[in-house]
Amino acid sequence: MDSGRQNKVPITRLSKFFDDEDFGLEIDFGREYVEGDLNMTVVLYSINIEKTDTDDVYKEVKSQDMRFFPPVELKVNLEIDASENSTYGPGGRLRYRDYGDMTFNIYDKQLKEKGTDIKYGDFIGYMVDEDTMKFWVVVDDGKIFSDNEHTIFGYKGATRTVKCTVADKNEFEGI
């Protein structure tokens, strides 16, 4: 068998009552709800790894040396966790409060149609009000989505769950 060739194997599970046409219909219904009814938009700032300057020794990147692909708007179903009152040190004198973590679901088909992907370290922007865009950094890109929660009736993966944590202002403030 040629190792450079990929064989496609048809999905035949559930074939008595569910097939690829039904799967496509379910995707269309779900996308209509997420992209039409909910209409929650995030902006993906995807890092262009090839054009980003890295340190020769440690392969670290300074924020000013990061290069990005053009921003892409994505329609998602998102949730932002409640913020927490935290301290910088054990004494509790220096306190701060920031937004909570963000988790969102996105249809994989939308990413393919837009010719983009979400990966670890990318930044996500979200308008929290009319004047403020807040940024999060991707900590789980959700690329493995074959579990029951992310499939439609266990047939095939449909949605990805992406987890993000608040980006520090020194790390990213938009482009």
Tell where the protein language model's regions lie, with residue ranges.
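Intrinsically disordered, low-complexity terminal/linker regions enriched in Pro/Ser/Gly
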Residues: 171-175
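Short beta-strand/loop turn elements enriched in aromatics
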Residues: 59-105
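Short, solvent-exposed secondary-structure boundary/capping segments
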Residues: 87-88, 103, 142-165
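Short beta-strand and beta-hairpin "edge-sheet" elements
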Residues: 124-149
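Short coil-to-beta transition motif at edge beta-strands of beta-rich domains
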Residues: 42, 112-129
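Short alpha-helix capping/helix-loop boundary micro-motifs
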Residues: 100-116
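Core residues of folded domains in eukaryotic genome-function proteins
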Residues: 100-102, 120-122, 132-134, 158-160
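Active-site-proximal polar cores
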Residues: 1-77
